[in-house]
Amino acid sequence: PDSNGARYYMNHQVWRPNHDKRGIGGDQVMMALSSWNLYYDYTGDESVLENMQYMADYYLAHSLSSSSCKWPDLPFPYNDSVEYGNYDGDMILGKGFLQPDKAGSFGFELVHLYKKTGNEKYLEAAIKIANTLAGKVQPGDNDHSPWPFKVNAETGEPGAIVDQEVWYEGMSKDIGKKRAIIKKSDYATNWTATLGLFDELIALQKGVSIAYRKAFEITLNWL
């Protein structure tokens, strides 16, 4: 275990004997769950299923945006204070920013885990993720995906880089003082798992199937 009691891979994206200071990768937990899901199906190794539950339980307990946020009940992809024990933001943009595509991936893996264990908490969390994403979906265009790549969970504003600087408090005032190049994080294409999340919940007849079907069609048409 790491210094906060969690297993090392729940805090870090790189293994180094002298203790790497970077937090986890944005899709790290979801990719591990996806791989373990396939491996468990192949081997039936119960220790693999136990590890899947450990990762999902820890991430659920330490990563979700508040239900009062504009983007509620979604996991933050990064632990800004690496060994503090919570995931609270984005590796580049900092605290408060999440990545909707990673949330969809996590929800998809939670459904797989629910189907393997029968544990309703995984299904309930997946439904909350799907509800938020379905409620936020937009048609998209050449410059905007149906959901932004990065968004501030509390304010609902997409993440932004100004003159190659990441967003910071007071940036809007600085923009007004100079000619600045602004690049918002409005575009991503990693939506396959999100489509899978909607598809799984529709098949299970859980959650709000009408909203999921609409979001599925909007996203598929955009892709």
Task: Annotate each PLM feature.
Residues 1-223:
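Glycan-recognition and catalytic cores of secretory/periplasmic carbohydrate-active enzymes
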